[in-house]
From Swiss-Prot:
Thiolesterase that catalyzes the hydrolysis of S-D-lactoyl-glutathione to form glutathione and D-lactic acid. This is Probable hydroxyacylglutathione hydrolase. It catalyses: an S-(2-hydroxyacyl)glutathione + H2O = a 2-hydroxy carboxylate + glutathione + H(+). It comes from Schistosoma mansoni. Pathway: Secondary metabolite metabolism; methylglyoxal degradation; (R)-lactate from methylglyoxal: step 2/2.
Length: 240
C-alpha cells in the first residue's frame, strides 16, 4: 500500500473516498496556514482516520492556530514524507503570520520539484497582506521562490489565474508572454480544466508581483523601489 501526504485537505469525506478507491495510506498533512479554507478539514480528517484505525497521522504547519497540528515547522525545516520524497518548509509572514510554503522533491531524481504555496503565490498574482507587509512578500516571492529552478511546479491554493492575468495586463499591456498565457488559461477554464499547476518560469515571465524589478512594472508603479512597487501593485489588485 502506497503512503501519501495531503496539502490543505478541506474536504475530508471526498479525500477519504479517493484514498480508499486508490488503496492508499495517509501519512501526513502539509498545512500552509490557519484559514479555514485551508486548515478547516484537518481535525475532521484526523478524527475519521482514527475511526478507521489509522493512528499517527502527522499534521505539519507553522502556526498553532492550525487545527490538529502535531509537528510545528520553522523556516528551513526539512523532513521526509515518504521513502523517496522530502520537503523543505519556508516561513512567510505575509498573508498570515506562520504561513508556510513547502518545496517537495524526490531524492536521486531528475524530475522537477513542486512547491505548494497556499495563499503566498498564486498563478499570476499573490495573496492579500492580511498579517504581513510588502517587505515580507518581496522576501517570499523574490528572494526565495524566484530562486527555484524555472521548471519547479507551482501548486497554489486558489483558481484565480484568469483574473490575476487580466489584472497583470493593466500593469504590463505590452507583455506578449502574459497575453499568450491568458489566452491559454482561458481555453483551459472554458473546458473545465484547472490552470494549476504552473511553473516558476511562467511566473517570472507573467506575474507582475514577481516582476517588480522590471522597468515597465516600476514605471507603472511610479517608483524605482521594487518593494514600493509590490505594495502599490497589490493595492491596485485589491481594487481591480
Amino acid at each position: 500500500m502506497s503512503s501519501e501526504q495531503l496539502q490543505d485537505p478541506v474536504e475530508p469525506d471526498k479525500i477519504l473516498s479517493a484514498v480508499t478507491q486508490r488503496g492508499l495510506r495517509l501519512e501526513s498533512i502539509l498545512t500552509t496556514h490557519h484559514h479555514l479554507d485551508h486548515a478547516g478539514g484537518n481535525l475532521d480528517l484526523v478524527t475519521k482516520c482514527r475511526k478507521q484505525g489509522l493512528e499517527g497521522l502527522k499534521v505539519y504547519g507553522g502556526d498553532d492556530r492550525i487545527g490538529g497540528l502535531t509537528d510545528t515547522v520553522s523556516h528551513g525545516y526539512k523532513x521526509r514524507l515518504v521513502a523517496t520524497s522530502t520537503f523543505i518548509a519556508w516561513l512567510h509572514h505575509r498573508h498570515t503570520t506562520g504561513h508556510i510554503c513547502y518545496l517537495v522533491t524526490e531524492e536521486n531524481s531528475t524530475k522537477e520539484g513542486a512547491v505548494f504555496t497556499g495563499d503566498t503565490l498564486f498563478l499570476g498574482g499573490c495573496g492579500r497582506f492580511f498579517e504581513g507587509t510588502a517587505e515580507q512578500m518581496f522576501k517570499a516571492l523574490i528572494e526565495v521562490l524566484s530562486k527555484l529552478p524555472t521548471t519547479t511546479k507551482v501548486y497554489c491554493g486558489h483558481e484565480y489565474t484568469v483574473k490575476n492575468l487580466e489584472f497583470g495586463l493593466t500593469v504590463e499591456p505590452k507583455n506578449e508572454a502574459l497575453k499568450h498565457r491568458l489566452e491559454a488559461v482561458k481555453r483551459l477554464r472554458a473546458s473545465n480544466q484547472a490552470s494549476v499547476p504552473g511553473t516558476i518560469g511562467e511566473e517570472l515571465a507573467t506575474n507582475p508581483l514577481m516582476r517588480v524589478s522590471e522597468p515597465d512594472v516600476l514605471a507603472h508603479a511610479k517608483t524605482t523601489d521594487p518593494i514600493k512597487a509590490m505594495k502599490t501593485i497589490r493595492e491596485e489588485k485589491d481594487r481591480f
